């Protein structure tokens, strides 16, 4: 199980990552990583970076049956 410090250090080394990538790298369940990332965000140590829908290749994200699953969410240190 990863610690909050390990998540912070991994973000420092890699720059920005998705929660799923952090989960795989640290071999920790994604709900736990999500909670740690939210904690880092509330402490002002990490920032959530969301892609804008205008980056959608087809331009149909609003009517996408997957509910904007194509939009990625990244995490980085402040």
Curated annotation (Swiss-Prot):
Keyword Transcription regulation on entry: yes
Key words of the record: DNA-binding, Iron, Iron-sulfur, Metal-binding, Repressor, Transcription, Transcription regulation
Gene3D superfamilies xref list: Winged helix-like DNA-binding domain superfamily/Winged helix DNA-binding domain (1.10.10.10)
Keyword Lipoprotein (UniProt): no
Highest taxon of the lineage: Bacteria
List of residues binding iron-sulfur cluster: 56, 61, 64, 70
Molecular function via GO: DNA binding; iron ion binding; iron-sulfur cluster binding
InterPro entries in the record: FeoC, Tscrpt_reg_HTH_FeoC, WH-like_DNA-bd_sf, WH_DNA-bd_sf
Function: May function as a transcriptional regulator that controls feoABC expression.
Annotated family: Belongs to the FeoC family.
Protein name listed in UniProt: Probable [Fe-S]-dependent transcriptional repressor
Organism: Escherichia coli O7:K1 (strain IAI39 / ExPEC)
Gene it is expressed from: feoC
